[in-house]
């Protein structure tokens, strides 16, 4: 029998402010010792391709939780962001830490068929790998004096560091691109929700989510060239004024009686 474990609220942060995705209920089919439900808070980190995640992220015996929400904003957000079956949303939890490392705990929310699910990232195997790497470095340090070619290990370490720098540069570039796209999505979502409120359109109306989605998709299509340049790392952010004008034009068109 399923039971509700907790409720998750997480923040989408951007330069124009923060949008909170609320009331994501996590349910489990497995029995738990605690009978009380708690509230988790977190923040959006990034989107990931589930097919490219390391094997240690998800163990075979870990729990997968079913996610539900009565929030129209949350439903619209997940519907828009999880259209790709392999896409996941990484959330860093504020109130929960990994028991072994005392590092922040992470959830990955994803869609499986028509159901919304999530799981906590398993860091156990990562810590084992880190331990093996530390042990290997210690062994290399002990045998360094007996290496016949002086400086050979230094060269290897230097090359490794250069590779890491190159990887970090690529990661920073991707993060910068993701930040620009996330900022576009956050600003667009706020403008649409604000425009609907100004027109007296309540989220209790049957076609509210449909109107939100077609406006969102149409705005993305309108600015497709700018978004393409952003994805290639050569474009600037779409200005607030330009996006506001687009949303106003679309809402006038879609809500015209």
Swiss-Prot record:
Gene name of the encoded protein: SLD7
Family annotation (Pfam families): Sld7_C (PF18596), Sld7_N (PF18636)
Keywords noted in UniProt: Cell cycle, Cytoplasm, Cytoskeleton, DNA replication, Nucleus
Lineage: Eukaryota, Fungi, Dikarya, Ascomycota, Saccharomycotina
Name used for this protein in its record: Mitochondrial morphogenesis protein SLD7
Compartments in which it is found: Nucleus; Cytoplasm, Cytoskeleton, Spindle pole
GO BP: any one term: regulation of DNA-templated DNA replication initiation
Species of provenance: Saccharomyces cerevisiae (strain JAY291)
Main location: nucleus
Highest taxon, organism lineage: Eukaryota
Record text on subunit structure and interactions: Interacts with SLD3.
InterPro entries the record matches: Sld7, Sld7_C, Sld7_N
Family: Belongs to the SLD7 family.
Described function: Required for the proper function of SLD3 at the initiation of DNA replication. Binds to SLD3 and reduces its affinity for CDC45, a component of the replication fork. Required for mitochondrial morphology.
This protein's GO CC annotations: cytoplasm; nucleus; spindle pole
């Amino acid at each position: 029998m399923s039971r509700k474990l907790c409720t998750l609220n997480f923040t989408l942060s951007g330069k124009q402010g923060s949008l909170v995705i609320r009331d994501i209920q996590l349910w489990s089919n497995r029995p738990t010792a605690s009978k009380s439900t708690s509230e988790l808070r977190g923040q959006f980190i990034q989107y990931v391709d589930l097919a490219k995640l390391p094997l240690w992220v998800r163990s075979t015996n870990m729990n997968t939780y079913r996610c539900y929400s009565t929030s129209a904003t949350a439903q619209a957000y997940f519907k828009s962001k999880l259209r790709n079956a392999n896409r996941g949303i990484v959330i860093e939890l504020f109130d929960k830490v990994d028991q072994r490392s005392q590092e922040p705990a992470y959830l990955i929310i994803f869609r499986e068929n028509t159901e919304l699910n999530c799981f906590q990232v398993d860091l156990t195997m990562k810590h084992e790998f880190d331990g093996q790497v530390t042990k290997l470095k210690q062994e290399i340090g002990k045998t360094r004096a007996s290496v016949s070619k002086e400086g050979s290990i230094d060269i290897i370490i230097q090359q490794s560091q250069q590779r890491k720098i190159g990887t970090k540069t690529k990661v920073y570039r991707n993060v910068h691109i993701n930040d620009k796209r996330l900022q576009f999505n956050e600003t667009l979502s706020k403008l649409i929700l604000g425009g609907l409120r100004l027109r007296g359109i309540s989220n209790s109306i049957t076609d509210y989510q449909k109107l939100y989605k077609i406006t969102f998709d149409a705005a993305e299509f309108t600015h497709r060239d700018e978004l393409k340049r952003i994805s290639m790392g050569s474009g600037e952010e779409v200005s607030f004024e330009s996006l506001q004008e687009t949303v106003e034009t679309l809402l006038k068109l879609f809500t015209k009686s």
